[in-house]
C-alpha cells in the first residue's frame, strides 16, 4: 500500500513539511559522502525558512499540553494500561520542557553564523555553490566525514525539540483516525463533509492499482481524482473502479 497524506489546515501543512525535512537531514547527514552532506546542509536551510514562518514553538507547546490533559483524563481507567499512559505523559512532558527551554527565535544561532548565511545566499542562485564561488565551503566538503557530521549535528541539534514535538503531535494525529474502505467510480470519488471535522486525510492505495490521487477538500466537500502516473504525457483520470482506504485524522 502507498500512503498519501493531505493536510486540511496550514498548521498541519507546516508540520508535515518540517517532519519531511528533519527526516531528510537525518538520512543525508548520516552518510559519509560530501554531496550527501551538502544536501543535508541545504535541507537545514529549508527547515530554517519553514520554521520561521509561523509561531511554531507556541503552537507545539499548546497542542502538547492539550494532549497531556486528555491523557490525564484516562487515569484510573481499567481499560487503559497505566504503564503505557505514564510513558506517553512522560514523553509529552519532556518534549514540552525542551521546547520551553528554547530561547529566542528558532534557528537564530544559524542566522548569526556569517559563513553559513553566505552559503545559504549562494545556494539560492542556480549553480551558485561551485568551488570557485565558495572555496571555503569546498574545503569543508573535503574534510573528513566525521568532522562534517560533527558540524551538521551542531547545526541541527538545537532544533531537535521542534523535531521531537512534531513527531509526537503527528503520531497522535495519525493514530486518531479509523480507516474506511472506499470505492471510486470511473476514477473519481466525492464526499459531502456534512459537519465532519478533520485536520488531515490519509489515502492508502494498493500498489497494484498504479494510480496517483489528486485531492482537494474544504469544510464542505472532498474530491479525489485518481490519475494514471504519467511522466511524459499529461496525466489522465483512470476511468475505472478503484478501491482505496480513507482515514480522517483529527486531534
Swiss-Prot record:
Pfam families, A to Z: ZapD
Keyword field: Cell cycle, Cell division, Cytoplasm, Septation
InterPro entries per the UniProt record, alphabetical: ZapD, ZapD_C, ZapD_sf
GO annotation, biological process: division septum assembly; FtsZ-dependent cytokinesis
Statement: the UniProt record of this protein carries the keyword Calcium: no
Any one Gene Ontology cellular component term annotated for this protein: cell division site
Domain of life: Bacteria
Subcellular compartments: Cytoplasm
Biological function: Cell division factor that enhances FtsZ-ring assembly. Directly interacts with FtsZ and promotes bundling of FtsZ protofilaments, with a reduction in FtsZ GTPase activity.
Oligomer status and interactors: Interacts with FtsZ.
Family: Belongs to the ZapD family.
PANTHER family: CELL DIVISION PROTEIN ZAPD
Name of the protein in question: Cell division protein ZapD
Organism: Azoarcus sp. (strain BH72)
Amino acid at each position: 500500500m502507498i500512503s498519501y497524506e493531505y493536510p486540511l489546515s496550514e498548521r498541519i501543512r507546516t508540520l508535515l513539511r518540517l517532519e519531511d525535512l528533519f527526516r531528510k537531514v537525518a538520512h543525508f547527514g548520516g552518510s559519509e559522502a560530501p554531496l550527501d552532506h551538502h544536501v543535508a546542509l541545504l535541507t537545514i536551510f529549508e527547515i530554517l525558512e519553514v520554521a520561521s514562518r509561523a509561531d511554531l514553538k507556541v503552537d507545539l507547546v499548546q497542542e502538547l499540553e492539550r494532549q497531556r490533559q486528555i491523557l490525564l483524563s484516562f487515569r484510573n481507567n481499567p481499560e487503559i494500561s497505566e504503564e503505557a499512559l505514564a510513558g506517553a505523559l512522560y514523553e509529552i512532558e519532556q518534549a514540552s520542557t525542551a521546547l520551553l527551554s528554547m530561547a529566542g527565535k528558532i534557528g537564530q544561532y544559524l542566522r548569526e553564523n556569517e559563513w553559513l548565511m553566505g552559503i545559504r545566499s549562494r545556494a539560492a542562485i542556480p549553480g551558485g555553490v561551485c568551488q570557485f564561488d565558495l572555496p571555503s565551503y569546498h574545503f569543508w566538503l573535503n574534510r573528513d566525514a566525521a568532522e562534517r557530521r560533527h558540524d551538521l549535528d551542531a547545526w541541527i541539534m538545537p532544533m531537535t525539540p521542534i523535531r521531537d514535538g512534531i513527531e509526537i503531535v503527528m503520531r497522535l494525529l495519525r493514530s486518531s483516525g479509523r480507516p474506511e474502505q472506499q470505492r471510486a467510480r470511473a476514477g473519481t470519488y466525492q464526499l459531502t463533509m456534512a459537519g465532519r471535522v478533520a485536520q488531515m486525510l490519509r489515502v492508502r492505495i494498493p500498489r497494484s492499482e498504479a494510480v496517483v490521487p489528486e485531492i482537494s477538500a474544504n469544510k464542505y466537500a472532498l474530491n479525489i481524482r485518481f490519475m494514471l502516473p504519467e511522466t511524459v504525457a499529461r496525466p489522465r483520470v483512470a476511468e475505472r473502479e478503484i478501491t482505496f482506504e480513507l482515514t480522517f485524522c483529527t486531534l
